[in-house]
Design a protein with these regions (language model features):
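Extracellular glycan-associated modules
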Residues: 1-173, 188-216, 221
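A general structural motif at alpha-helix termini
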Residues: 182-185
Length: 223
């Protein structure tokens, strides 16, 4: 955990209109969460998802994997200049698949989901398919995982906004599952929905931000 994040309450934060108790605010310059234990080791099939609120539009990492000795391999969800969401997966030999959304609005909450199933890559915005891509990317080697910044040879692309319910599965969720999961806390997931869940970072502990931040690297064993 770096540079203690601010926890926001949905009843006092303007514009908050999504189904969790709060969120973590990232300042765009130094805040990020270093996930010490990588939640994935096999990148054949997976799902990344989470609620995101963007204050600005530039290259900002929502969630992703990197390598501190080689900047080429990455697997991430980010917002780019032009306010487009990008799901990008690349190995050390630069074989990659990128899936871009149309421009989104700033100062608005979105539920963003990226799925990979074999060579099929899909990007969902608020439960609806935004764009797809296809390609073979050999299993990359990563040694970092972070929320709110891209951690590779150097730390870059700090996130400016709020995040909540960032989650990782070792399988590709279906469209129906995504539309169900987006409205639930981890405790409400069905047995089917929690199948393959590797980690869930609520980022919403209002009563005890310190306790919440200290426990965010744990796997979602309470699902």
């Amino acid at each position: 955990i770096k540079n203690g994040l601010v926890m926001f309450n949905k009843f006092t934060t303007a514009g908050l209109s999504f189904p969790v108790q709060g969120s973590a605010a990232f300042n765009g310059t130094s805040d990020f969460i270093d996930v010490a234990t990588l939640p994935l080791s096999d990148f054949t099939n997976f799902t990344y998802s989470g609620w995101a609120y963007f204050n600005t539009a530039s290259y900002q990492n929502i969630f992703g994997f990197g390598n501190t000795t080689n900047s080429t391999p990455v697997s991430l969800i980010e917002i780019q200049s032009g306010a487009r969401i990008n799901f990008f997966h690349r190995d050390a030999s630069s074989q990659s698949v990128g899936v871009l959304s149309p421009a989104v609005n700033l100062n608005q909450w979105y539920f963003i989901t990226a799925t990979k199933e074999g060579t099929s890559h899909k990007l969902y915005i608020d439960g609806s398919i935004s764009n797809t891509g296809s390609g073979s990317v050999p299993n990359p080697t990563f040694n970092t995982c972070s929320i709110g910044a891209l951690n590779r040879v150097s730390l870059t692309n700090y996130f400016n906004g709020n995040l909540a319910n960032v989650a990782i599965w070792n399988r590709a969720l279906s469209s129906d599952e995504i539309n169900s999961v987006m409205w639930k806390p981890v405790q409400a997931l069905s047995a089917t929905e929690s199948n393959g869940l590797q980690a869930w970072y609520s980022l919403d502990d209002i009563a005890s931000p310190t306790a919440s931040l200290a426990s965010m690297e744990q796997l979602a064993t309470d699902k």
